[in-house]
């Protein structure tokens, strides 16, 4: 039965990832990049400023922009940054890293669009703000069926399949480092995680905020130590990445097509640009203008890939471990780091993976809960979902690595297709919001959003109409 499932999933992934999704992600990302006038470069300083502003704003009764950023980063900065990169290099060669950089740079524009839309079309309930692709598909496009389809896909993807990926990597890391029984670890994971997911969204936000920053800094610190210790190899490694990306150097076994496909796959799994996941976290923030959260989430994509994923890539490529046949995933990263700093690194990385993976479990779970709320407000359904999440965490701990990752790729691809269509159709709303933000910044103001700046503001619930009714036509930005 498992072999049949592996075969079906493999065929579906080949159809999705060989051409279709690569073309869609690159073409939409390039389109948004040009329409936003290379926002990811020209507004990089503003991204940092807005993030710092969000970190300074605190409220007991709402989720701050920085907390929303941390929820999304908790999902992004998971095992994909460590295990996914190793798989990309093993299957696609060093050139896969180059294509990950490209997809992150142009994908950050897609992330800006989807997260800004999530803020514009967010809704409010007793627990605070909620939103995401399902909500802007219903309220912006007036297509509830499309929102429902996406809600089902993201709930299955993140809450169910992606959480099994995280637990799978954690269990393998502990098995490699300490010989820990994988089922036992799975039971421990669900015991701890179960106490958290019954605690509500705000508890999730606070936990994510407290863990994710420390983990990222710790891992980057170790990576920088490795980089500076091997600084003389850096030019050669960079040259290897570029040559392999275009098929000029096949020594590592990665042809152009393999490098491109693996780079895009693992890049999207790690930074989630255009996938429609981060907008669910972006919508929860209390902010004065939707563009602010769009900028913060775009910065998250760049940070995740260009800093954290690249750190893993250098750890691997500075060693000879990636030449070892059959070595992939977390085992490759553990072997590579151990070659740099000693055998203790395997255990250190296992513990780090546990914490990284746990953060990702938190973010992934929240995405599913938000979209179940879109489908049905039933508390019983949420309870069933929580039990399903816990069951899949145990399944991931004992399942085969390849099947788990292949399932993740399949559901991720379906999500991307639905979301990209929606954000393309709604992109003019974002372009208008950005013009409004830029206009207010040039006037020396802290931008504040009013929904009547848009010609059509049907479906927008949480943003007020401007106080000044005079000359409304002139305030609208075409």
Swiss-Prot record:
The chain crosses the membrane at residues 14-34, 85-105, 145-165, 185-205, 211-231, 236-256, 298-318, 342-362, 381-401, 411-431. It is a multi-pass membrane protein. Signal peptide: none annotated. Pfam families: Na_Ala_symp (PF01235). Keywords: Amino-acid transport, Cell membrane, Ion transport, Membrane, Sodium, Sodium transport, Symport, Transmembrane, Transmembrane helix, Transport. GO terms for cellular component: plasma membrane. It is found in: Cell membrane. InterPro entries: Na/Ala_symport. GO terms for molecular function: amino acid:sodium symporter activity. Belongs to the alanine or glycine:cation symporter (AGCS) (TC 2.A.25) family. Probably functions as a sodium/glutamine symporter for glutamine uptake. PANTHER family: AGSS FAMILY TRANSPORTER, SODIUM-ALANINE (PTHR30330), SODIUM_GLUTAMINE SYMPORTER GLNT-RELATED (PTHR30330:SF5). This is Probable sodium/glutamine symporter GlnT. The lineage of its organism: Bacteria, Bacillati, Bacillota, Bacilli, Bacillales. The gene is glnT.
